[in-house]
A protein has these predicted regions:
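SAM-dependent methyltransferase
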Residues: 3, 7-74
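C-terminal lobe and adjacent flexible extensions of AdoMet/dcAdoMet transferase-like proteins
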Residues: 66-111
Length: 111
């Protein structure tokens, strides 16, 4: 059994582009902005963290995360090429089938 999860194409194409989340606390701040990337179903997350140090100053930490997902058919083909005979597909952290607006897909593949 091989179990994995990925963002859905709805998540990368409709939800993430333009997504912005900012959090500000006394000892910590985070900026998270997401942009559409060039490849189909791909996005770039730009994250900036400000962490308060013991001396009261703040240090800055930047991260860039690039993510891409594919259509379910592509995962089906790749799983078959890897020797898997079948898979079940679930969505959004629940025991349910995906819908058009599901944001996360969970694959349970069998050899």
């Amino acid at each position: 059994v091989f179990i994995f999860d990925v963002h859905s194409t709805y998540q990368t194409d409709e939800v993430f582009p333009g997504y912005s989340y900012h959090e500000n606390a006394e000892d910590f701040a985070m900026l998270w902005d997401t942009y559409e990337d060039v490849a189909p179903h791909s996005i770039v997350h730009e994250l900036t963290f400000f962490v308060k140090e013991e001396d009261g100053s703040f240090s800055r930490h930047d991260e860039v995360h690039e993510e891409r997902t594919y259509e379910v058919l592509t995962y089906d083909i790749l799983l078959e090429q890897a020797g898997f005979k079948s898979f079940k597909l679930y969505a959004d952290f629940e025991d349910k089938e995906p819908t058009e607006t599901s944001t996360r897909w969970f694959f349970v593949a069998q050899k």
